[in-house]
Amino acid sequence: MSSAHFNRGPAYGLSAEVKNKLAQKYDHQREQELREWIEGVTGRRIGSNFMDGLKDGIILCEFINKLQPGSVKKVNESTQNWHQLENIGNFIKAITKYGVKPHDIFEANDLFENTNHTQVQSTLLALASMAKTKGNKVNVGVKYAEKQERRFEPEKLREGRNIIGLQMGTNKFASQQGMTAYGTRRHLYDPKLGTDQPLDQATISLQMGTNKGASQAGMTAPGTKRQIFEPGLGMEHCDTLNVSLQMGSNKGASQRGMTVYGLPRQVYDPKYCLTPEYPELDEPTHNHHPHNYYNSA
């Protein structure tokens, strides 16, 4: 295989648009800061093109070995493509063990095939931030916050359950004292003032509105008969056995002779059918009378 790097064809359409947006996020000032930091740690010159100088992975492997000795056991000086890709892969594994988060690390092709230089720069900035937390004097990136663990006794934790934290807001010394359930009566009197006791529960207070003397006396359940006479006037009671015209008329019909739903219905009239005769005990069993048939549906 030749020593030339892999070359991709030009990007078109959406791929070109995405590549241009990523390129616009690249910070050249940060690049200069990273160049000075890496060259100062390794003692090697990167070259005029920053990304091309890091593409073989040699400087990157030496750089992580300076920050964390023994991170990369073998650095390939060969110009073959697979050796250079191996160097980049070893660098990625080393910074992962160093503490850089996986979502901050670039892929090998982002650098080797020039697909995403912005992500490569972000990885180096994340490495600088991690180096600061380990005591290295770096002027690039921001220092990660150190973990501050606190241990509390179980008694102290139980006491905290009785306190409303300011995170939840403050009740301003308000309480639910004197509050009643939703929908119940509210009495507008103060027992300390010696005022009269509230009305009995059978009276509707004016706070709830007024019924204007109306009551539910004489009201019946929905669907039942409504008597249209007044007993106080001496009127006669309505006959409850008859269907009043207020409910409509049955035109003299009744349920007499009706059977339960599903039973057989007799379709003969006894006036036109002979009564069956049965032989007496002393008579012969044969009867010459015509048979009577009972037809049923």
Curated annotation (Swiss-Prot):
Tissue: Smooth muscle, and tissues containing significant amounts of smooth muscle.
Species this chain originates from: Rattus norvegicus (Rat)
Biological role: Thin filament-associated protein that is implicated in the regulation and modulation of smooth muscle contraction. It is capable of binding to actin, calmodulin and tropomyosin. The interaction of calponin with actin inhibits the actomyosin Mg-ATPase activity.
Name assigned to this protein: Calponin-1
SMART domains: CH (SM00033)
Residues with Phosphothreonine modification: T170, T180, T184, T259
Family: Belongs to the calponin family.
Top-level taxon of origin: Eukaryota
Location of the Calponin-homology (CH) domain: 28-131
Keyword Transmembrane: no
Modified residues (Phosphoserine): S48, S175
Keyword Phosphoprotein included in the entry's annotation: yes
InterPro entries, A to Z: Calponin-like, Calponin/LIMCH1, Calponin_repeat, CH_dom, CH_dom_sf, SM22_calponin
Keywords, comma-separated and alphabetical: Actin-binding, Calmodulin-binding, Phosphoprotein, Repeat
PANTHER family: CALPONIN, TRANSGELIN-3
Pfam families noted in UniProt: Calponin (PF00402), CH (PF00307)
Start and stop residues of the Calponin-like repeats: 164-189, 204-229, 243-268
Record note on quaternary structure: Part of cGMP kinase signaling complex at least composed of ACTA2/alpha-actin, CNN1/calponin H1, PLN/phospholamban, PRKG1 and ITPR1.
